[in-house]
Design a protein with these regions (language model features):
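DNA-recognition alpha helix
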Residues: 189-201, 212-216
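Rossmann-like S-adenosyl-L-methionine
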Residues: 1-186, 191
């Protein structure tokens, strides 16, 4: 029952559409991959254990699922190879062992920039570490829920959703104040600030109150 609940949470958080490609890293025998196949345009599973990959392919055939592919290899290295070949998943599911994601996997996720990452974890410590690394790469932790797959012990399975921040609404602008007010007396005017931001970023400052909220000026 708890395993079914975990899969339902992962599917719900992924918010998959028929236009989406889903990449499932550390997919095992393809349980989560195949559970998402019906809602997605295409699903891709990656697993390092050869027999598990064969079982995943057999499970797809037995269930009449034709939009699933499975690859055998290290999750991080395989993800980097898929990225180099042009694969750009909309949703990525990761279900790593207790040691969490390796550096290659973090880098692959950063390069692929899926809009959603569903992280299934069996170790809260490595989960916290990896979430912090993904936040540095543009993701926001939206939800976290627990599933008691290990009753009568301290271990817990956690399902987290990380969402890519909108690059249009989150832009870092390096402002050289000295350059902005060079040859000007006193503080820069609001008009000068708007012109400077427009020149440097192509964005229009819509309201003075928004600028004040950010800068205090």
């Amino acid at each position: 029952h708890q395993a079914q609940r975990l899969y339902e949470m992962a599917i719900s958080q992924a918010e998959i559409t028929k236009a989406d490609t889903v990449l499932d890293l550390y997919c095992g025998v393809g349980t989560i991959t195949l559970a998402m196949a019906g809602a997605a345009g295409k699903v891709i599973g990656v697993e390092v254990v050869p027999q598990a990959v064969e079982d995943a392919r057999d499970n797809a055939v037995r269930n009449g699922i034709t939009n699933a592919e499975f690859f055998c290899g290290d999750a991080g290295q395989a993800a980097l190879e898929l990225e180099k070949s042009g694969v750009r998943p909309d949703v990525v599911v990761v279900d790593p062992p207790r040691k969490g994601l390796n550096a290659d996997t973090i880098e692959a996720l950063h390069r692929m920039s899926p809009r959603r990452i569903v992280y299934v974890s069996c170790d809260p410590a490595t989960l916290a570490r990896d979430v912090a690394l993904l936040k540095e790469r543009g993701y926001t932790l939206k939800t976290a829920a627990a599933a008691d797959l290990f009753p009568r012990c301290a271990h817990v399975e956690t399902v987290c959703l990380l969402v890519l921040r909108n690059p249009v609404t989150h832009i870092n602008i390096d402002v050289d104040v000295e350059e902005m007010v060079q040859d000007k007396r006193g503080m820069a005017t609001y008009g000068q600030i708007k012109d400077y931001v427009l020149e440097r970023s192509g964005l229009k400052v819509s309201t003075q109150s928004r600028y004040h909220a950010v800068t205090g000026i």
